[in-house]
Amino acid sequence: MENTLVKSLYRDTEKYADQTVQVSGWIRNLRDSKAFGFIELNDGSFFKSVQIVFDTELENFKEIAKLPLSSSVKVEGKVIATPGAKQPFEIKAEKIDIEGLSDSDYPLQKKRHTFEYLRTIAHLRPRTNAFSATFRVRSIAAFAIHQFFQERGFVHVHTPIITGSDTEGAGEMFRVTTQDLNNLPKGEDGKVDESKDFFGKETNLTVSGQLNAEAYALAFRDVYTFGPTFRAENSNTTRHAAEFWMVEPEIAFAELGDVMNLTEDMLKYAMKYVLEHAPEEMEFFNSFVDKTVLERMNNVINSDFGRITYTEAIKVLQESGADFKYPVEWGIDLQTEHERYLSEEIFKRPVFVTDYPKDIKAFYMRLNEDGKTVAATDLLVPGIGELIGGSQREERMDVLVDRIKELGMNEEDYWWYLELRKYGGTKHAGFGLGFERFLMYITGMANIRDVIPFPRTPGSSEF
């Protein structure tokens, strides 16, 4: 008999009513008495489990009744509609085969476990309701983002993981080497001789695919990357991880306003898609994790995003009368408390802050006519503050070279990036979305470690 997915049973219960089906899955819960028992069976295809009813008519009733949690079984039985019960149907088992036994020391017994504890068993935590919901939503949201760009004719570019350039100019990068760390070759100046290394120069794990994506935008017009990025930032916070995923579109013949429109369209599309394709999971998050999740998402979907310049935002914050921990003055990098005040108290919806001081932004952002600010934007959203950062890129060769020198960066490292301006350069723009930060926003999960399957953070690289 062909296996039927639990998802199919839930989505089309009438079709399967009174039919004999075969389902396979893992035991989430088991209750038994002398004459009959109940199994909550989850097959991974759906958030909810299916209830299996079995009785002494089974040849192996006693064996089944003693099965430990997480044992895997194959069940054949009739689908019985139960409109008055918690679940719309159950399966009356006619045959249960044991696929794999679980040891009695299985750590996920029927009790509440803290997220901190579940991080220590990251290989087992997707079997819990919270993480089953989280990682299915992660999958659905990733698909939605790909579909958004594909429907609009964007080319998906696979940018390199190993790179010789630092997009942010921040220097917080993981080094890649095959050298013997106990016997590093050194030059006459006593410094490590990078020419003897695998690539013949210093290389690192990428912090962003943006620079490479720009090269492809100047050939394909509209492109995007969606891949892992790495920061050797020793920040032990709920919002930082050493390995995370970034969505980075680049569009040619575009200015800052175009990329803000793209940002707004993509966010609304992805959120709508998740609400439509993961209703059970989103209801779970709204009930048990963060009771404002659905309201927050619908606020984003149904709002026209606000727009305000950095200079105007500073003035609004200074005149607000609010007691901020960090003083507000022109030139500061806005702190989370400032960002949340703007989005939650002033606009009460997502808002783009634009035209930041050049001294707090990256070298590649286009210098404005005032010479003090750049064509950059951060999208601030209620609940967390900054969600997305974007900018119009500097297309003028001389201005870009001046910025690189001004920041003390090595011009030679960016020779190919500068050449993009020599050969038919044009105005172009893009943004970066930290995918995990987006997931935290739509699920209410408060720690980035809980939206990545196997988190990599300072002092932790288990699994």
Curated annotation (Swiss-Prot):
GO terms for biological process, alphabetical: asparaginyl-tRNA aminoacylation
SUPFAM superfamilies: Class II aaRS and biotin synthetases, Nucleic acid-binding proteins
Entry GO terms, CC: cytoplasm
PROSITE patterns xref list: AA_TRNA_LIGASE_II (PS50862)
Primary location: cytoplasm
This protein's UniProt keywords: Aminoacyl-tRNA synthetase, ATP-binding, Cytoplasm, Ligase, Nucleotide-binding, Protein biosynthesis
Catalytic activity annotation: tRNA(Asn) + L-asparagine + ATP = L-asparaginyl-tRNA(Asn) + AMP + diphosphate + H(+)
Location in or out of the cell: Cytoplasm
Enzyme Commission number(s): 6.1.1.22
Keyword flag Zinc: no
Any one Gene Ontology molecular-function term assigned to this protein's record: asparagine-tRNA ligase activity
Assembly notes: Homodimer.
UniProt family annotation: Belongs to the class-II aminoacyl-tRNA synthetase family.
Protein name: Asparagine--tRNA ligase
Organism: Bacillus cereus (strain ATCC 14579 / DSM 31 / CCUG 7414 / JCM 2152 / NBRC 15305 / NCIMB 9373 / NCTC 2599 / NRRL B-3711)
Native organism taxonomy: Bacteria, Bacillati, Bacillota, Bacilli, Bacillales
Record gene name: asnS
